[in-house]
Design a protein with these regions (language model features):
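Extracellular/periplasmic, surface-exposed regions of secreted and cell-surface proteins
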Residues: 1-183
Length: 183
């Protein structure tokens, strides 16, 4: 089993239902890591309810477009799911006595990497909520760009080392796209 200790905080602010602001932060520590046990993962978002502005309320367009809210957010998430409970502490195997000259023996069954870190996914999202005819028809459009650094993966090793692989933070993954929701 493993242990995790986390703290989480959130601050939300809105001014007159027009300008929206949110800040979140998470601080995690986990026993699956050794030298880099703690991770800080913040996020921020802002939005603007354009339809709450007087210039919008007083215009003819507000009769057709009943909701208009551009928004943007950026956040960091952490992940350590690729690490076993004891990967950073070492694992040992037992050689059966009949295979080792009549005596039992212990051996390292895996290489240890105490420098493993949290995977970090950094996500930027830009979106627009728009509704027509008192929101009888509405769209939510989002563009996202996510980059994950320090991917937890096993790196193959040459056979003469006596081990097939070692767990490392190696690699980067980028995902991006557009999402459209129609209601």
């Amino acid at each position: 089993a493993y242990r995790i200790l986390s703290s989480f905080g959130r601050i939300n602010y809105n001014y007159d239902m027009k300008y929206l602001f949110s800040f979140v932060a998470r601080y995690d520590g986990i026993s699956r890591l050794k030298d880099n046990r703690w991770g800080f993962f913040p996020g921020i978002s802002v939005g603007w309810n354009v339809m709450e502005e007087n210039f919008w309320k007083d215009s003819k367009i507000s009769e057709v477009i009943s909701n208009l809210k551009p928004r943007i957010s950026y956040g960091v998430n952490g992940n350590v799911n690729g690490i076993g409970n004891f990967d950073v502490y070492g694992a040992y195997g037992l050689v059966d006595a009949k295979n080792y000259g009549g005596s039992s023996a212990f051996y390292n069954s895996a290489l240890v990497n105490t420098g493993l870190r949290w995977e970090q996914s950094k996500t930027l999202e830009v979106g627009l909520d728009i509704g027509f005819f008192n929101n009888k028809l509405s769209f939510i459009i989002d563009y996202f760009n996510r980059r994950t650094n320090d991917l937890l993966t096993k790196q193959a090793l040459p056979g003469y080392l006596g081990f097939s692989d070692i767990m490392t933070n190696m690699g980067t993954l980028r995902n991006s796209g557009i999402e459209l929701e129609v209601k």
